[in-house]
């Protein structure tokens, strides 16, 4: 058996995008291609050669190619789903591939899925009050499973998240749900360096358009943010914890 066949296979969607492209750049710059076989979904033909030159296996297709996604998920040990947190069909196709892999090969892969903090939003009837004055405010804790399980299915991104939860409940994959708030900063590396966040440029555009910066109410609202480089590092930390440290455990 060659060293290549011993490598764990990573499959990433959104690999030429803002978050996924930043993750890919960090992996390539740190020689992850020596330890992993990395494949990335690409929609544009001109990205195929770019990925090949980086040592990445291009998978030509889109999120609408359900059979392709199922096939790739079935082959992967680790999946980064960073393309679209509202594309339910692609998430279901990936989970189907992981389910087949588990039942046919007895292998439980790792699925790291990108959702968004919009899933925690609620309706507002005005400027609101501070958390200390709001007796119905909910403080979120990653360790509080029951609170997260109670999020209604009509919340933003939630229908897709439930596809990931299904894989976890069935025990066919080890799942991680990434729920970043506003991601800011220029993308990292050649695949993502020309990409920026959605929210911050919109705020800047509105400021330029109205020739003044605006705020809501008294300006005391809290808006969490994370830099795209820090977020990419978190994905790799999960990859490390689920592969390197676990494989070293007795």
Give short role names for the model-derived ranges.
Residues 202-226, 234-238, 245-249:
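A conserved pocket-lining segment of Rossmann-fold NAD(P)-dependent short-chain dehydrogenase/reductase
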Residues 184-196, 217-229:
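Glycine-rich "substrate-gating" loop/helix at the edge of Rossmann-like oxidoreductase active sites
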Residues 74-139, 154-159, 163:
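NAD(P)-cofactor binding segment of oxidoreductase domains
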Residues 4-33:
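N-terminal Rossmann NAD(P)H-binding glycine-rich loop of SDR-like oxidoreductase domains
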Residues 52-78, 86-90:
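Conserved Rossmann-fold cofactor-binding substructure of NAD(P)-dependent oxidoreductases
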Residues 161-193, 201:
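Conserved beta-loop-beta element that borders a ligand/cofactor-binding pocket
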